[in-house]
Amino acid sequence: ISAAAALAAPTLALAQARPIRLVVPYAPGGPIDVTARLMAERVKDSLGTVIIDNKPGGGGNIGADIVAKAAPDGLTIGIAAVATHAINPWLFSKMPYDAAKDFAPITQMLRVPNVLVMNADTATRLKINTLQDLIAYAKANPARLNYGSGGNGSAGHLAGEMFKRDAGIFAVHIPYNGGNPAQLALLSGQ
């Protein structure tokens, strides 16, 4: 965060007169959104007001494209992620931006791990207590399990597909419009 503040110093006078728009290409409430909000609060004394603008959709492409096409005045910055800059160029035949040329990096804010979790009530009902139990259940009950992710092509989606391949199981992928909606569906037993 300190590095982000230092790199943004040339726009400090302008940023204090007008707010900085921080585009988050994912749904509100997810880990990247929460991190962006914490960062905005942390830098407000040195950079002025930072407004979070969530623009989910297209695996992050909608928000990233807004940043790519913004005026280069330092007042619009964005969160880049694995999906927007490493995965999507391989998934989409026509990208609205060039991930390598249309952005200038500021700093790495965080690393987000992929975690495999299951609704506790469902796990109890199916007698799944370990990863081995989950794999055994999936093999004995093909196509009975679903898994959710923050969207098609997201890191969670690709991690789920790799897990299925490596475990030799099948589960139906349910893409959500962001990690937070996927988490809410999980907690509610969907």
Q: Model regions: which residues?
A:
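Oxidoreductase and adenylate-handling cofactor-binding alpha/beta cores
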Residues: L131, H157-F170
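N-terminal (or domain-start) structured segment
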Residues: L14-D102, R144, N152, K164, ...
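N-terminal export signals
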Residues: I1-A13
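Short coil/turn segments
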Residues: A27-G29, V82, R111, A120-I128, ...
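A conserved helix-loop-strand patch within extracytoplasmic ligand-binding domains
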Residues: I106-L145
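Periplasmic solute-binding protein
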Residues: A86-M95, M109-T124, E161-D166
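Aromatic/hydrophobic pocket-lining residues that form π-stacking "cages" and hydrophobic walls in ligand
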Residues: A36, L134, G160
